Amino acid sequence: MAVNENEIGTVQTQATAPAPQPTAQRQAQRPTGAPGSTTGINHLMRRSGRLDGSDARSADALQVFTKVKEEAIRHQDLPDDFDIHRFDRDAQQVGMAGLLIVKLAKDINGSMKAFVRTLVLDNLPGTRIRPRTHKINNGLTDDIIEEKVLPRDVFTAQYWSKIGEFLRNRYNIPGLEVLSAGPRAVYADFDFKDELAVKNLLVESVNICEDAIARRNNETPFSIATHIKAENEQLTCNLDYNGIPVKDSCGNPIRSDMVISTSRGKKTNVPENEFYDTDSQLNQVSLFVDLHWTPTTGQQQGMFGVTLPGAALPPQFTPYIVITDVRKASWIQAWTLEMWLFALGNAYRATASQAWARTLMPKIATSKMRDIGALGYYSELGKAIETRTEAFMADDSNFVMLMNKMVNQNPAFQIDIDPMGDNSAIEQVILDAAGGVNQARAVSLIFQALTNLYGTDFRQFYNLAEAGPIIFDNHHEVDLGHYTDEHGELSDRRDLDVLGAMNMSEGNDQEWKTWYATQVGNDHIVRRMNNSKGFDKMYLGNVTYTGRARRLTFNPKFITAMDAAAAAAGVTVTMENLITNFGQQRFAGYTGMGNMAVSGSAQVGMAGSMGQTYGAPSYNAPGTWY
C-alpha cells in the first residue's frame, strides 16, 4: 500500500461503518455477491459441504497461530495485548484469505487506532481463482498471456477496505481508523506445522505493529549519536563470502553472495566482560554482483591511467551491486526506518578495496552459472576462459587481469523491493521515493530519518535540486522464487543473472541476447516476464515462484552522501577481514564509470587498528522529530 501523508505504511479507511450488530450476528454475517452475478451463488443458496477447501488453510493457520500465541504468552515471549483474526476468502469475497495480527492502541492524541499486520495466505494449488489474462499486441496479432495471481495482486485498496470494515464490525467501534503495519505474503509451501517458524512470524508481526504505534506516538528515533556513543566502543564490519543463502521469515532462500554484518564491540586493549561484553551484531545486508553488458568503443585504461597492452576494447561490463536483504540482528526488537537506513549504508562497505570483486573470484566447487570465465565470450578471444583450474587460481593476478580487461571498476547500487516481504512497511517508503504521488512525502521521511540517524541535517550532504532523485525506477521487475540447484539445495531464482545466462547459453550470442531482452528490454513487461519464465525452465528446471520484486537503482550521489554523513557523525568503522590486494595487483580506480556508478570507496578502518574516525564525534547530538 502507498505511504500516507500522515504515517509510514498507513492506509486510510472510510471514517464510518455500518451500525454494529450483536457479536453472534457479526460473526455469522457474510457479504453477498452483486445482484445478477455468479459470485454470490453460494451465499444466496447456501449448503453445508464444500470440495474446494479454499478456506481450509486459513482455518489451519488460525489454529496453529492461536496455539503458538498462548505458548508465547505463557513463556513471557509476548504480552497478551494483541488479537489474531481469520479473514476468510469466501466470507469476504477476496482472492486470498488472510490472518490479521491486530493491536489496538491510542495515538498521541488519545484516539483509538487499530494497527494491523496482514498475513496474506497464498492459495494452495487447485484453489479456484481465475488467472490474470493480458492481451498484448505483437504488431500483427494479439498475444494472450495468462499470469498467475500473486498475493500482491490481491492486496488491493478494495481488499484493505474490507479489512477495515471487518475490524470495525469485529470490535464494534464505528469510525475506527485502521492503519497498516505492512502486508506479508505467506506462500503455499510454508509449513504451518513448523511451530518455531510460526512463532518467529508471529513475534515479528507483533513487533512490527508496535513499530507503527511507536512512530505514530513520536517515539525518540534511533540515532548513532545517542545509541552508539561509548568512547571505548567501535563499529566493526565483517564480510562473509560463503555464498550460503540467508532465509526470510517464511524460509525462502535469498541470494547472498556477500553478507556484510555490523557489530558493536570494544576497542583494542579495552578489557571486556567475558560473558557479557562480547561483540553484539546490529544488522546485516546481503548482496550479489550482477555484471551488465555496457559495450563501448575505444582503448581501455587500466590502473594508474595506463593503457593496457593488447587491449582493443575497453571493459564491456559494469558491475551492479544488487541488495537482496536488509535486516536487524535477531536480538533487536525494534525495526524503524532509521535502523533500516543504518543497515543499508553498510552496503557501501563493499567498495572498500573493491571487496565486491571477490564474489566473482573462481572457485572449483561453485555453480557453473558463477564462472567468471564466460566473460571471454565478449573479449577478443571470443570464447570462455578456463578459470576454475588450479593454474588460474594459483595466482590472483590472473583474476585481476581478467577483471581489468572486462569489467568497469566502479559499481552501481540497486535494491530489490518486495512489497509483500518482511520489510514491506519500511521498503514501501523507498519504493514511493522512486516515483508516484507520494514521492515528495517519502523523500522527506527518508531525509528526516537520516537526519535523526546521523545527528546532522542530511540536506548538508545531499542537495535534491542539484543531485536529483535519490533513487530511480526503470520499471525493472524481478521474479522471486526458488529452485533446486545441482547440490540438491533450495536456491534463489535470482541466481540466473547476466553471468549465469552467459554460462548457460554457452557462447550462443543470439540465445544470450534473447534472454537479456527478457530482463531489460523495451517489450511489454508482461510478455518479457512470461518469456523470462521460459528461460528459467530451460536453465534452472522447475521453479517455484513466490512473488515479484521491483529492482530500483540508487543515485550514486545518495550512496556517497550517506557515507559522508556517517563520517561527519564520527562513526568509527573497522573492517575485520578486508583483503586489500589480489596477489600483487589491486583491482581499483578505473576512472571510466557509468552514470549510476559510484566513485571512490567507503571510508573504513582496518582490522587490528583502532579504526579510523572521520570528523569529530558528536555523541550528544539531539534526536529530531520524525
Curated annotation (Swiss-Prot):
Residues 1-44 are annotated as: Disordered. The keyword Magnesium does not apply. Disulfide bonds: none annotated. It comes from Pseudomonas phage phiKZ. This is Chimallin. One of its GO terms (cellular component) is host cell cytoplasm. Belongs to the Phikzvirus chimallin family. Residues 12-32 have a biased composition (Low complexity). Self-assembles to form a proteinaceous shell that encloses the viral DNA and compartmentalizes proteins and DNA during viral infection. This micrometer-scale compartment contains narrow pores and is the site of viral replication, with the proteins involved in DNA replication localized inside. Provides a surface for docking of capsids during packaging. Probably protects the viral genome against host defenses. It is found in: Host cytoplasm. Keywords: Host cytoplasm. Homotetramer. The tetrameric protomers further assemble as a square grid.
